[in-house]
């Protein structure tokens, strides 16, 4: 430091020095000055305030020490000693200082402040004097004298800055306390704290300074705590200036306000009492970035561990929660991130956060939905009970998010929770129970179409649900109890996963086999097709194709790599071998110079899918031992939350599934001995599964394990003769599959069973019929002829054509399986036996198939009561109708029988999908879809789904639509992958279903008046149900192709009745409606189809170009069909809402947009309704046949009549102009009505002639007699339409069932586009 030339000292003659101290002048050396000053310091140090004489004596000396000679002395030791003297002088002369000049006082205190910088070096020899100086100043509060100075603020700021700059970690507690005392006295005893002074304190809280000097931060923190009451108004003023008034110039710290608020809140929330309302104001700022900064700040304040801000300041908390819905994406994102800390530190606030996180879990921004999951999972990982079930439910929902990143995060998060709390048992049983649903949910995701989802589920299964790195026994125990605790859908998904992995293994095996063959064009084509198949099973199939080709090239060049891959996919590969092979193959494919190698990633995906990391011979053996322990009662079943019986049954089911995918792993004495033990158990399901395992895995039993063979044969014989039907089936197939002398074995079963058939004991018939049916199917050459006499003499004449018992007359349309009468069970199996016998023969030389089809048709026409003796119950009739329909469909899968099925028989079969019984419709639709999706049924059977538009139950219609989507997709994909001839294209191209559909609808028994607008509307709905799915995309100009199909039909006649004008008129009318729909859907469809469609000759005659060119629907009808003008509500367009009054209530038909919103349109005038009663069929929610309900509404006539009259009114059917009708069945009346003879109907027609007769619809509920009677338990049904079942009134159904099973009108709410398409059609 440089000082100006030293001024002259004051007159030294008047100065009295302490004894022994010579004069201090500028003539002496610095060392001498220091020596003499030390003695002066000692003198002042020993003086106290009471020494008045000495105070007066040394007053000149005190004034002398304040001269410029001392204050500006260049020697730091001199300055230190002078500062000590001055500090003592202020102590001695307190409360009055000997210096009267304000300028001098300011100069002195600035001088003393500068000397305090010496405190920085604690190792300095002078440190004790510096400490003495600080202690003296703090104890006496010497700086308080400065309050009288006008510009004291400069002194204080300098002091504060000095102290904060010198403090460091080498100072002891005393130094810090004296500094604190010094600054707090100035802060608390002054008139206020200036902004500059406040800045000198607050600057130490800024991160940059805080990191440089932690002690200064701690000192500032303690100072603020001590002076909180005094300094709070100054802090409030500062933040008010910056936050509210926007005066950033008031302080250099303005840009750090939010950091300061955070630090101040952590120090003492009371410092910010007046600031928090200002933050609420800032939260509502129009500036998004400003809101973001405030949200970040408040997130830290609310989320910090010990914060009670949310409780203390509810308005601010509520305002902050509102930012979860901020329009600015970063603000919402920040709010969501905060939630994690809040959940972990403040579980009591979870309830407040839940609703906001729910909304954000559906945020349009992917990043926000992703962070909601991260937030919840992070908290749950710390402690599961920090998150409630609702929050976990949000994560569960996001596993189906449209974005892969979000789905992946949700799935992985749930998997980690499951592993932590269920597998590792952290958190105890309560925690495991809380997340026990996760395993099912994760496996359900395997049903999704995305290959990425499937692969992630496989990865999660291998790493989280059943970790593959566990020891074999532990791994199998984990799998054993997991399988036993899964729900049925999860079990199916897991089975499908193993099936897909096994299928991919077989594809890779076939690819390796192609490598062994000599190169040829055929080989190259086959290899390319196989590579494409493999690529479909990998992520991003487009890119995967290139990688698979590259991998195939590497395989061709590297024989060792091929051999390793062969080991990996060989049936005998162990889990440990698989692990080694995967590592070796990945190492060979890897490129060390390429850190991110997408090719390597793809290869790993492939290897992970095909590697048997869970199951090998050792694993199967461990599973069998676990099951044996369960059988013996020594397992941990109860501890694992599974009953022993459930564990055994699930264990057998698991082994059964694995027997399909890993059959060679079962081949051991120990395994088969255990399975024999299971065969002897009383549990039917266990024995059935055991037989199937033998069937799948026992091909080498006869040669390698003779003792097992000897024990197995008598058991299989016994099961085939006296086991359950399922056991009998599996036993016959097992014998056929694993024994070389199967003809002898099957004959030993066939002969005694065929001789012992007795229709009078139906309870003992089912198993023999099952066994005989399967034997005749598996060995037709040996048993077809003997079976013919059994069929003719027993099955048809004795069993099917006779009713030996009276059915239950409770009126129910369906009953549980266990309540079905033995006779009907036997008849059902007899029908299946007929089908199996024919399927085994695969020819119609004996015309047996024609006879069988006539029999099945007769059963459908008679509605299940083949004898028409009315002894059979309603539910049994439903079972037999279903059996007959399914049998025709099964025979149609065999080409030789499909050719002889007549159009009439096909139509009868189709009408089963509109049966009055819900379960018949449901099961028939499932069987139809299952056969179609495997491409086993001819294309015309897909047209049957068009009739589902008439189904009164929304779920059935939705299921049918999904089936159509799947079938059409599969057919189109098959055509793309497999080039087919034009002839085969007729049976595969989905668009070719249109002519079949048109013909089927033209022969719909409900379609009796081609010009009736209501009937035309129903036809249009059925057409649209199919065409909507077909016309979603105009692939290959398919719209023009379908238009051409319809036009070509109008150039033909109906092959079923070529000379019947009425039949042809109906056909052409349906054609015109179809054209109307196609034109409306594809307005720009002006181009002509390049293909000339070929029509099936079974249904249409040869084209005649000049035959029919006129339009069969009027312009008015066309307009009504397209505009969707309101009409009486039908099941297709109304909400299931019960009437409040017993009188008729009119409904209007919904437009497409209204349908999509589930809105029903009410009311037309009663007068207009009277003219439309014939087509009104209100659909209300209640049980249709107990289990799956469709409520019927009674709609009585306008006049009060007896109940009987109302029944007659409801039983009026459409005019009987349907041709040769046999066994007519009238629409079922409302529950509780008795059968009324035709004569009584005719007598009462006059009583109701004023009211048009309502036309009941097949598969949908007609109007019942009254609302009250709709709740009754029995029902009646009357003949009315050929081969036709119309929906009957409902029977017994509890209120709970009614509510739970309420149905809504047909609609397609899955996408807005669908709704828009419906709107287009109605315009």
UniProtKB/Swiss-Prot annotation:
Q: Where are the HEAT repeats?
A: 385-421
Which parts of the chain span the membrane according to its record? none
Keywords, in A-Z order: Cell cycle, Cell division, Mitosis, Nucleus, Repeat
Low complexity bias located where?
A: 1153-1165
Compartments, record wording: Nucleus
Q: Which Pfam families match?
A: PDS5
Q: Which InterPro entries match?
A: ARM-like, ARM-type_fold, Pds5
Q: Polar residues: which segments have biased composition?
A: 1166-1176, 1210-1220
The question of whether Transport is a record keyword is answered with no
Kindly list the biological process annotations in GO that this record carries.
Answer: cell division; DNA repair; mitotic sister chromatid cohesion; negative regulation of DNA replication
Q: Where is this region: Disordered?
A: 1138-1323
GO cellular component assignments = chromatin; nucleus
Query: Which portions of the chain have biased composition (kind: Basic and acidic residues)?
Result: 1235-1246
Keyword Repeat applies: yes
Q: What does this protein do?
A: May regulate sister chromatid cohesion during mitosis and couple it to DNA replication.
Give the note. Answer: Chromosomes assembled in the absence of pds5a and aprin/pds5b proteins have a mild defect in centromere cohesion in vitro.
Q: How does it assemble?
A: Interacts with the cohesin complex. Binds chromatin in a cohesin-dependent manner.
Q: What is this protein called?
A: Sister chromatid cohesion protein PDS5 homolog A-B
**Organism encoding this protein:** Xenopus laevis (African clawed frog)
């Amino acid at each position: 430091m440089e000082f100006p030339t030293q001024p002259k000292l004051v007159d030294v003659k008047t100065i009295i020095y302490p004894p022994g101290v010579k004069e201090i002048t500028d003539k002496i050396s610095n060392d001498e000055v220091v020596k003499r000053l030390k003695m002066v310091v000692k003198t002042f140090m020993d003086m106290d305030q009471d020494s008045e004489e000495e105070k007066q004596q040394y007053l000149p000396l005190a004034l002398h020490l304040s001269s410029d000679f001392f204050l500006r002395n260049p020697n730091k030791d001199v300055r230190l000693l002078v500062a000590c003297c001055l500090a003592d002088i202020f102590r001695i002369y307190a409360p009055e200082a000997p210096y009267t000049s304000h300028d001098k006082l300011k100069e002195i205190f600035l001088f003393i402040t500068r000397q305090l910088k010496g405190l920085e070096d604690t190792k300095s020899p002078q440190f004790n004097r510096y400490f003495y100086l600080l202690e003296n100043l703090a104890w006496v509060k010497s700086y308080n004298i400065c309050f009288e100075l006008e510009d004291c603020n400069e002194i204080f700021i300098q002091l504060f800055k000095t102290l904060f700059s010198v403090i460091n970690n080498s100072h002891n507690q005393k130094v810090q306390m004296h500094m604190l005392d010094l600054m707090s006295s100035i802060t608390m005893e002054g008139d206020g704290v200036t902004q500059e002074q406040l800045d000198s304190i607050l600057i130490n809280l800024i991160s940059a300074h805080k990191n440089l000097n932690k002690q200064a931060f701690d000192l500032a923190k303690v100072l603020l705590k001590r002076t909180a009451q005094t300094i709070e108004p100054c802090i409030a003023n500062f933040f008010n200036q910056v936050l509210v008034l926007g005066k950033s110039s008031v302080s250099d710290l303005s840009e750090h306000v939010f950091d300061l608020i955070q630090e101040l809140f952590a120090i003492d929330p009371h410092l910010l009492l007046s600031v928090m309302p200002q933050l609420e104001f800032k939260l509502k700022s129009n500036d998004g970035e400003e809101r973001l900064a405030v949200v970040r700040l408040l997130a830290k304040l609310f989320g910090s561990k010990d914060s009670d801000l949310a409780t203390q300041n509810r308005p601010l908390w509520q305002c902050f929660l509102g930012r979860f819905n901020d329009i600015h994406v970063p603000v919402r994102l920040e709010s969501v991130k905060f939630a994690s800390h809040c959940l972990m530190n403040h579980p009591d606030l979870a309830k407040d956060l839940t609703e906001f996180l729910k909304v954000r879990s559906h945020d349009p921004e992917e990043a926000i939905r992703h962070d909601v999951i991260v937030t919840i999972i992070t908290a749950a990982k710390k402690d599961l009970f920090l998150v409630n079930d609702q929050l976990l439910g949000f994560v569960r929902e996001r596993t189906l998010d449209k974005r892969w990143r979000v789905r992946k995060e949700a799935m992985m998060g749930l998997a980690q929770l499951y592993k932590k709390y269920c597998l590792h048992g952290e958190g105890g049983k309560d925690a495991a129970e809380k997340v026990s649903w996760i395993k099912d949910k994760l496996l359900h995701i395997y049903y999704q179409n995305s290959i990425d989802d499937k692969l992630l589920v496989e990865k999660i299964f291998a790493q989280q649900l059943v970790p593959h790195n566990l020891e074999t026994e532990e791994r199998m125990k984990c799998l054993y109890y997991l399988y036993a605790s899964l729900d049925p859908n999860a079990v199916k998904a897991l089975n499908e996963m193993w099936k897909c992995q096994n299928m991919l293994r077989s594809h890779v095996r076939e690819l390796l086999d192609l490598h062994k063959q000599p190169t040829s064009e055929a080989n190259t084509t086959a290899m390319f097709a196989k590579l494409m198949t493999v690529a479909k099973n990998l992520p991003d199939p487009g890119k995967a194709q290139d990688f698979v080709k590259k991998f195939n090239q590497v395989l061709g060049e590297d024989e060792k790599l091929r051999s390793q891959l062969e080991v990996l996919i060989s049936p005998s590969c162990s889990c440990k071998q698989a692990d080694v092979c995967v590592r070796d193959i990945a190492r060979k494919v890897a490129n060390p110079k390429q850190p991110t190698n997408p090719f390597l990633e793809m290869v790993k995906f492939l290897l992970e899918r095909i590697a048997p990391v869970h199951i090998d011979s050792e694993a199967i053996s461990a599973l069998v031992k676990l099951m044996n322990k369960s059988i013996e009662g020594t397992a941990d079943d109860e501890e694992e939350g599974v009953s022993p019986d459930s564990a055994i049954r699930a264990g057998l089911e698991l082994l059964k599934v694995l027997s399909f995918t890993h059959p060679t792993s079962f081949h051991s004495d120990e395994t088969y001995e255990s399975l024999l033990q299971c065969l002897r158990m009383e549990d039917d399901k266990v024995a059935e599964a055991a037989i199937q395992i033998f069937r799948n895995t026992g091909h080498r039993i006869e040669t390698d394990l003779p003792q097992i063979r000897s024990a197995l044969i008598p058991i299989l014989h016994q099961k085939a003769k006296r086991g359950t039907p399922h056991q009998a089936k599996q036993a016959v197939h097992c014998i056929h599959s694993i024994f070389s002398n199967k003809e002898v074995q099957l004959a030993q079963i066939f002969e005694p069973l065929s001789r012992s058939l007795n229709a009078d004991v139906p309870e003992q018939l089912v198993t023999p019929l099952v066994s005989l049916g399967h034997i005749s199917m598996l060995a037709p050459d040996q048993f077809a002829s003997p079976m013919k006499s059994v069929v003719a003499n027993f099955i048809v004449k004795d069993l099917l054509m006779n009713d030996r018992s009276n059915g239950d007359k409770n009126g129910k349309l369906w009953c549980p399986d266990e309540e079905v009468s033995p006779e009907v069970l036997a008849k059902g199996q007899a029908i299946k036996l007929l089908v199996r016998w024919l399927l085994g023969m695969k020819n119609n030389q004996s015309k047996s198939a024609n006879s069988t089809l006539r029999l099945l048709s007769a059963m459908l026409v008679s509605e299940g009561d083949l004898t028409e003796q009315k002894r059979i119950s309603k539910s049994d009739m439903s079972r037999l109708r279903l059996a007959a329909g399914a049998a025709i469909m099964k025979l149609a899968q065999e080409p030789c029988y499909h050719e002889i099925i007549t159009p009439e028989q096909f139509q009868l079969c189709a009408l089963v999908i509109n049966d009055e019984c819900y379960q018949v419709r449901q099961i028939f639709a499932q069987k139809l879809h299952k056969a179609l999706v495997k491409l086993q049924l001819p294309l015309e059977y897909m047209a049957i789904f068009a009739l589902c538009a008439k189904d009164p139950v929304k779920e059935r219609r939705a299921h049918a639509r999904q089936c159509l989507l799947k079938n059409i997709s599969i057919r189109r994909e098959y055509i793309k992958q497999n080039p087919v001839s034009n002839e085969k294209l007729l049976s595969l191209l989905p668009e070719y279903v249109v002519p079949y559909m048109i013909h089927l609808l033209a022969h719909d028994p409900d379609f009796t008046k081609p010009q009736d607008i209501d009937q035309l509307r129903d036809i249009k709905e059925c057409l649209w149900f199919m065409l909507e799915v077909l016309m979603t995309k105009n692939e290959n100009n398919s719209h023009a192709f379908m238009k051409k199909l319809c036009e070509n039909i109008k150039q033909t006649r109906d092959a079923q009745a070529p000379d019947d004008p009425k039949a042809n008129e109906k056909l052409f009318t349906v054609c015109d409606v179809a054209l109307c729909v196609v034109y409306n859907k594809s307005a720009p469809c002006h181009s002509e189809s390049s293909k000339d469609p070929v029509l099936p000759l079974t249904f249409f005659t040869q084209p005649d170009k000049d035959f029919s060119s006129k339009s069969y629907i009027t312009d008015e009808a066309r307009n009504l069909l397209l505009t969707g003008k309101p009409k009486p509500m039908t099941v297709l367009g109304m909400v299931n809402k019960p009437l409040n009054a017993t009188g008729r209530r009119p409904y209007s038909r919904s437009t497409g947009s209204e349908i999509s919103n589930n809105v029903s349109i009410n009311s037309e005038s009663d007068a207009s309704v009277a003219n439309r009663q014939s087509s009104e069929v209100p659909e209300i929610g209640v049980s249709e046949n107990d289990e799956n309900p469709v409520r019927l509404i009674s709609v009585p006539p306008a006049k009060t009549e007896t109940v009987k009259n109302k029944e007659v009114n409801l039983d009026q059917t459409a005019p009987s102009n349907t041709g040769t009708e046999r066994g007519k069945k009238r629409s079922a009346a409302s529950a509780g009505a008795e059968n009324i003879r035709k004569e009584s109907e005719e007598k009462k027609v006059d009583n109701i002639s004023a009211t048009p007769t309502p036309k009941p619809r097949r598969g949908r509920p007609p109007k019942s007699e009254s609302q009250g009677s709709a709740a009754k338990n029995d029902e009646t049904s009357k003949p009315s339409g050929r081969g036709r079942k119309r929906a009957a009134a409902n029977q017994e159904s509890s209120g709970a069932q009614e509510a739970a099973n309420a149905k809504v009108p047909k609609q397609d709410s899955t996408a807005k586009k669908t709704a828009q398409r419906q709107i287009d059609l109605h315009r």
